[in-house]
Amino acid sequence: MKVLAAMSGGVDSAVAAARLVEAGHDVTGVHLALSRNPRSHREGSRGCCSLEDSFDARRAADRLGIPFYVWDFSDRFVAEVIDPFIAEYRAGRTPNPCLRCNERIKFAALLERGLDLGYDAVATGHYARTKVVDGVTKLYRSVDPGKDQSYVLAVLNQDQLSHSLFPLGNSLKMNVRQEAAALGLSVADKPDSNDICFIPDGDTPGWLSEKIGSADGEIRDESGALVGHHNGYHHFTIGQRRGLRLGVPAPDGKPRYVLDIEPVNNTVVVGGAEGLTVHHIEAIRPVWCSSEPVETWHGQAQVRAHGDPVPAIISAVPGGVAVELEDSLRGVAPGQAAVFYDGDLVVGSATICGTDRAGVKAEQAA
């Protein structure tokens, strides 16, 4: 098989490429240049967009003896990932850019170019598994629960999944590092990428302030009483406690959290922890990556990349998905992805637009 190995400059993508070479595939390494100014990203970053990362990817490819190229997708990355990220925060929502990057860049722009050039598949170092069942490529969790990345891949459709390879899905991270060391790969001990790759130093509020600006606004409690001020609602997300400048203490003396963000009024609403409890989720733009389920079914819902799945009743409704949680969740924010599982099988995903806490309607978030 002729395979494009997406090489970020990290240990996982390097070992994934090595395994494909060992399996006898015709492998070409590709590093995606996603920043218009890669020197603006700090050296030693834990992202994947710095010059240092591209050099690490090239060294790994040289060690494996495979061709290597750097492909510039920076313009498309801005249009498909960065601009929507800014727009979501401006609208008071909390997006996950990694899902968008997988959907629109790694398994769209890269895959499209690869197929045009005669490649059969794109491979990455994600910790997830696929299996073809009755002609359908199904997505599953990794065997390493601590590193499972199926959540950020749940936006992929059947066409994308059928041309995707995840060589690390049956491996533990500790074994991958050992394998990298045995192969003589210089990235064997390189730290994992945890930051948003296009935000220097991980300062998301500061970065957003440069893009959106900072407008002073009010912080009010659920009764509407003024309790503080803020210098930009994009500094906050649902469930946040830190950074609240409150001049009026809560009557019960307990901590207060962000319960809602009202961008139209430039207002942040705060309240007690009990106000974060969610039992019902509304979501839009569903993607059924492992075949469309029945109209209503029992499964599990996960709302954060490293969150715990919660038993739920999941129903297809006009315009999206309704989720009744059997166990409540806290701090669920519009803009997050809800990913639906049946055990280890990833059934699909959708974008959260409202909860019984926030009360946001689907048409407002569309």
Swiss-Prot record:
Its EC number is 2.8.1.13. The active site is at 101 (nucleophile), 197 (cysteine persulfide intermediate). One of its GO terms (biological process) is tRNA wobble position uridine thiolation. It catalyses: S-sulfanyl-L-cysteinyl-[protein] + uridine(34) in tRNA + AH2 + ATP = 2-thiouridine(34) in tRNA + L-cysteinyl-[protein] + A + AMP + diphosphate + H(+). It is found in: Cytoplasm. Residues 147-149 are annotated as: Interaction with tRNA. Signal peptide: none annotated. It holds the Pfam family tRNA_Me_trans. ATP binds at residues 6-13, 32, 125. Gene3D superfamilies: Adenine nucleotide alpha hydrolases-like domains (2.30.30.280), HUPs (3.40.50.620), Translation factors (2.40.30.10). InterPro entries: MnmA-like, MnmA-like_C, MnmA-like_central, MnmA-like_central_sf, Rossmann-like_a/b/a_fold. It is an enzyme of class 2 (transferase). The record marks 126, 336 as: Interaction with tRNA. GO terms for cellular component: cytoplasm. Belongs to the MnmA/TRMU family. This is tRNA-specific 2-thiouridylase MnmA. It comes from Cutibacterium acnes (strain DSM 16379 / KPA171202) (Propionibacterium acnes). The gene is mnmA.
